[in-house]
Amino acid sequence: RFYSSRDETVIQIEIEPGVNDVNDALVFSFKAMSQLANISKTHFTHSVLVMHFGNTTLPVVAKTDLECAKGFFIYVSENESQWRKNCLTIQDH
């Protein structure tokens, strides 16, 4: 899904990761969105990942600023820990 909100242009995907695969799924998903945004003609500012865990729990929503995330996913000048600390926001809804 692609949308604009306020001053943001967002790329969003929704996934249903296994309980044991949450971290790998999170990193893989944000890497894919970062790579797509990097080659896109549209200037995306943020990526959003919505993770669903069955019918009984509320989804977890993670968001990253794409410019900030480039250091980890595109340029490989930062590590995952730096990306999580500086660029990633996770909320349960």
Question: Predicted segments — roles?
Answer:
Residues R1-P17, K41-H93:
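Polar/charged, Gly/Pro-rich intrinsically disordered segments
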Residues V22-F44:
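Short, non-transmembrane amphipathic alpha-helical segments
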